């Protein structure tokens, strides 16, 4: 996601998808 304070949330969401 964009380089923002919520960028951590974006990364977390991506990991959640990989974590099936």
Swiss-Prot record:
Cellular component, GO annotation: extracellular region
Keyword terms, alphabetized: Apoptosis, Cardiotoxin, Cell cycle, Neurotoxin, Secreted, Toxin
Subcellular location: Secreted
GO molecular function: hydrolase activity, acting on ester bonds; metal ion binding; nucleotide binding; toxin activity
Reported tissue expression: Expressed by the venom gland.
GO terms, biological process: apoptotic process
Role according to the record: Toxin that shows cardiotoxicity on isolated guinea pig heart and auricle and neurotoxicity on isolated rat phrenic nerve diaphragm. Shows antiosteoporosis activity in experimental rats. Also induces apoptosis against human leukemic cells (U937 and K562). Has no effect on normal human lymphocytes. Apoptosis has been evidenced from damaged nuclei, cell cycle arrest at sub G1 phase, increase of early apoptotic cells, augmentation of DNA fragmentation and also a reduction of telomerase activity.
Protein name in UniProt: Bengalin
Natural source organism: Deccanometrus bengalensis (Indian black scorpion)
């Amino acid at each position: 996601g964009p380089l923002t304070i919520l960028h951590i949330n974006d990364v977390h969401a991506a990991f959640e998808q990989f974590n099936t």
